[in-house]
Amino acid sequence: MMENYKHTTVLLDEAVNGLNIRPDGIYIDGTFGRGGHSRLILSQFGEEGRLLAIDRDPQAIAVAKTIDDPRFSIIHGPFSALGDYVAERDLIGKIDGILLDLGVSSPQLDDAERGFSFMRDGPLDMRMDPTRGQSAAEWLQTAEEADIAWVLKTYGEERFAKRIARAIVERNREQPMTRTKELAEVVAAATPVKDKFKHPATRTFQAVRIWVNSELEEIEQALKSSLNVLAPGGRLSIISFHSLEDRIVKRFMRENSRGPQVPAGLPMTEEQLKKLGGRQLRALGKLMPGEEEVAENPRARSSVLRIAERTNA
């Protein structure tokens, strides 16, 4: 069934170019998806290149297993654990580049059975890995009203969060919601002011999905691990699709592109300064999709690619 869903990889060439591929390098594609980035990376390798791909979606793993290439291997798990995967293979400090394409993919959105979309009726699931953790329906049925409101406000930036949370709890008390259409209808009815250009359930679905999959924590942990696993000169190439993701990536790159912040006038020896270490990253800028790509793939509109390089510090 999954092969019926077309996936157009956003900023494909730009993200891979950002890795500055070495033919004999070792790289990580932390979000294999349907393999667009991985296949392009493999095409730029020599015989000694090595690509470790990661994904927690079983459907992505099934696609990855069709790649018959000794330079390629796939891991079923969250990219937040990339530090562990690298350590298990004795590759700490040897990784030449890490690519992350954040958020939900088109095949996940377009498959009603995955429960990510308010546009298609399906089970209210939303898990990247349906074999682990609580589904969206299970969480919404057990969560406190205040907790639901907090999630909607924090992860969806939903201004009617309290009103929507109350409606969700009341509906679940009457009859537990199990379908995406049911949640979308409850949210729409609880939203007093409609946005002309956006479905009223957009922010709620985003927020619940992020919460169910711990998406922002996953990003923060992966970024933190990247500093340990990257070789000097190794690249980070990260595509984000909304402001919450991009804010985390931007802040991480900015903070690690500065040296230690020492108060002016604080007496320190050269040896003490050396122990503090220098900046760990060099930010190489950001890219956004051009008009042509957005016209071909409207979902690319909000994407931002940020690139950074590991220093020798």
Swiss-Prot record:
Subcellular location: Cytoplasm
Enzyme Commission number(s) from the entry: 2.1.1.199
GO CC list: cytoplasm
Broad class of where this protein is predominantly found: cytoplasm
Catalytic reaction equation(s): cytidine(1402) in 16S rRNA + S-adenosyl-L-methionine = N(4)-methylcytidine(1402) in 16S rRNA + S-adenosyl-L-homocysteine + H(+)
UniProt-listed InterPro entries: RsmH, SAM-dep_MeTrfase_MraW_recog, SAM-dependent_MTases_sf
Residues that, per the record, bind S-adenosyl-L-methionine: 35-37, 55, 79, 101, 108
NCBIfam families: 16S rRNA (cytosine(1402)-N(4))-methyltransferase RsmH
Name of protein: Ribosomal RNA small subunit methyltransferase H
